Amino acid sequence: LIYGVASADSTLTDPAWTIEAAMEALDKAIEEDNLPAYHQLRADILFNKGEFQQAFDEYMIVNNSDVASASSYYLAAKAKERVTGFNIGDVIDLLDKAIAKCGTNMNAEAAVYVLERINWRLRLAQYTEAIADYDLYYTLIGGQVLPNFFFLREQAKFRAGDLEGALKDIQAAIQGSPSTPDYYAEEASIYVRQQKYEDALKSIERAIAIAPDFGACYRLRGVCYVRLKKKTEACEAFNKAKELGDPLAGKLIKEHCK
């Protein structure tokens, strides 16, 4: 109660109603009866004070008790990621435990943890594992996703080398949001990797029709024309990309247009 009031009203000056007073009351309670619930609240207070290592230690007391929960493991992960020099693998391990605690009847709560785990897996370039988590997330929320979900999963599939899977996802994103030029540009990039340059050019045209100043698309158009041995068209596209401020166009002009 003391912590709830003190954290909600920063204008309080009564020393009996401060966060410090709440901590003192908790310490006394722990001395009398070392309950995990007290450590949970102590962890919450320390977290909000920015004392993340201490908060993590308190959350782990809860996690090593018989009242450990998905939430307590998740909060431990959130504290751990804020500790200087933390190990991403440790955070993923805590999220694994949070998800496992959700049991077989996983729901929207588990979906939040899975989404968090995806972000960390991507930072470690664990693309195959991230894709599996995207699939799990999709199932957990009953397929109720926005087009951007397919774009993000496509990025992971692209990096994992699953070009057909990536193409299927970006086309699902396009179907959901046909006026987003980035999706067509991404589709073009996949076609370039597949050496389907004519298909890539069609996707680029769709992107440019929506966003005429999309410099990267002109650069990609130039790359397609280089591969198709059409130097004049390639250089025209590279110069347009440079005109629009694309940072890579100048190098391509030097390589192909001199």
Predicted regions mapped to residue ranges:
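Canonical positions in the second alpha-helix
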Residues: 28-29, 61-62, 97-98, 137, ...
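Register position in tetratricopeptide repeats
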Residues: 2-5, 48, 82-84, 123, ...
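Residue-level recognition of tetratricopeptide repeat
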Residues: 35-36, 69, 105, 110, ...
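Structural marker of alpha-solenoid helical repeat scaffolds
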Residues: 31-32, 65, 101-105, 140-142, ...
